[in-house]
Amino acid sequence: MKSKIIALGDSIIKGVILNIESNGKLHYALSDCNIVDQVANKTNHEVVNLGKMGCTIEAGERILDRHLAGIENAEYALLCYGGNDSDYNWRAIAQSPKGEHQPKTPISVFEKTYARIIDKVRQAGLTPIVMSMPAMDAERYYQFFTSVFSDEEKRNVSRWLKNGTDAIWAGHELYNDAIKRVAAATDAMLVDVSKAFSQPEKYLCVDGIHPSRAGQKTIASAIAHAIV
């Protein structure tokens, strides 16, 4: 009987990619070679993918709580959070750049909740595997999310950022560092997939944040190597 991996996280775990249609329109879809399925094939495990697009760490804890009773026969819990937690409501910033704007999950809440999730999966008998966020292309992401904004809204976002897209990258790295701190503090296995994205433009979709099929393959190989 194969061992089982429970995967919890956001759209990266879910396997979401951004496709470009023949007419140039963009749409999100599920990859036919997502990370979790590739890890299962490489390590001879069964998988239960509980990933959800847009999932923050607090929403992830609620999903885990609903499924705790059914995961006790699994071996690993693959965890991937941070991309949505570290992000902002860019539409709100575009419309009110002088207002108070914070990431979707305060970093202190993010760290405490992540540590609690790790403890819960351990209590259920699983080995937690904490995945860092892959590197992002901040400039590409900026161009993507502002593409639907008016010129005035784009100027508002640009003024709010002050340091340009470097500020987006810095926020991303702040939460990536938090992930590594939590993994170290809880003595959880860390798979730092950001190291595999030395040239993120080769491994990301046009939105600058979701791994392409090539990126998913790279991440899956890093995770499988850590498990085997």
Model feature map: region roles:
Residues 1-51, 67-73, 77:
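Serine-esterase "nucleophile elbow" of acetyl-processing enzymes
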Residues 29, 57, 100:
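Short gly/ser-rich anion-binding loops that grip negatively charged ligand groups
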Residues 32, 60, 113-114:
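Amphipathic coiled-coil/heptad-repeat helices and related helical stalk/stem segments
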Residues 45-46, 51-56, 134, 197:
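Short, solvent-exposed turn/loop segments enriched in Gly/Ser/Thr/Pro and often Arg
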Residues 55-64:
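Structural motif
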Residues 11, 17, 53-56, 84-85, ...:
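Gly/Ser/Thr-rich beta-alpha loop segments that engage phosphate groups in nucleotides
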Residues 6, 12, 48-51, 57, ...:
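Generic detector of intrinsically disordered, low-complexity, polar/charged segments
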Residues 65-228:
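Alpha-helical cap/lid subdomain in secreted, periplasmic
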